[in-house]
């Protein structure tokens, strides 16, 4: 059975109370990958996967999930500023549908508007060269996306 693909809050109900999550930032040329600690407090970058073909890309991401005993995924969904879904969001959803056929781990979608821009500003502010930024931007965006999702889940647990 394919993995469920749900908004973050709904996906969280399908994840066990404890266990690492993998955060993914889909770029056109790379996939940034981050992982949380089992208590879901902190996101850390682990790899930038160079995109080649879907099967190879998915195989690498699934291997990273297995290596870290992940129990689910947080996939950044690049919405337009007005909240609508454009071509990039549609492409991300297509990736999620195909990826879900290869795993049973629930996939949570998280609004990633401006994540790459925010990360790029931070890297520029820290004098990271353009060449170095190009190599690490998607991994850092994955950290940003996953940490935002983790923080949202903590806030909901405190409120709820």
Swiss-Prot record:
| Gene3D superfamilies assigned to the protein according to its UniProt record, in alphabetical order | YqgF/RNase H-like domain (3.30.420.140)
Give the NCBIfam families listed for this entry.
RNAse_H_YqgF
* Annotated source species: Rhodopseudomonas palustris (strain BisB5)
Keyword Hydrolase listed? The answer is yes
Keywords attached to this entry: Cytoplasm, Hydrolase, Nuclease, Ribosome biogenesis
Localization per Swiss-Prot or TrEMBL: Cytoplasm
What function does this protein fulfil? Answer: Could be a nuclease involved in processing of the 5'-end of pre-16S rRNA.
Q: What is this protein called?
A: Putative pre-16S rRNA nuclease
Question: Member of which family?
Answer: Belongs to the YqgF nuclease family.
């Amino acid at each position: 059975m394919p993995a469920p693909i749900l908004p973050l809050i709904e996906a969280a109900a399908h994840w066990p109370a404890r266990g690492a999550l993998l955060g993914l930032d889909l770029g056109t040329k790379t996939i940034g990958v981050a992982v949380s600690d089992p208590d879901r407090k902190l996101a850390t970058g682990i790899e930038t996967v160079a995109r080649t073909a879907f099967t190879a890309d998915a195989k690498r991401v699934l291997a990273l999930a297995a290596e870290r005993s992940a129990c689910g995924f947080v996939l950044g969904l690049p919405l337009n500023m007005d909240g609508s879904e454009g071509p990039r969001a549609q492409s991300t959803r297509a990736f999620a549908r195909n990826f879900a056929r290869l795993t049973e781990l629930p996939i949570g979608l998280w609004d990633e508007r401006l994540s790459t821009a925010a990360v790029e500003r931070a890297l520029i502010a820290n004098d990271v060269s353009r060449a170095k930024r190009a190599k690490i931007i998607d991994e850092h965006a994955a950290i940003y996306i996953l940490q935002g999702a983790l923080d949202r889940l903590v806030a909901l647990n405190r409120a709820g």
